[in-house]
């Protein structure tokens, strides 16, 4: 999607990234989801009441959705925990179900849509400022936005 915007094939693109920074592109943040741990209630880490330190995941198989794999490998790798990723799933629900079935932990970008899939689980924040993913609209800096493009971004509230 980024090459399409850079090459003027598309005017606006929506991407999900932890820290989107593109030199030739202007970014307009749209949504931000915190990345959290989803833990079965019987798991030892479910009893914690404070954010979980990344080191506490050491030795625990983790399930993560693909869209946060780069973020997890980067942040967890600094703490030698990245190799604990046991499965990369296509969607949050699959990671949650995997954690539920195998009594382990899913690391997911949590949104309101995930609430119904986690009623029997414990949601815990992760103690690291880089544990989030954003949806951002990308626009080429050198390109003037069309009337329709401006209207769209204004309508959804990312352009004032």
How would you name each of these model-derived features?
Residues 123-160:
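A late-sequence structural motif
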Residues 21-33, 115-126, 133:
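Ligand-binding "clamshell"
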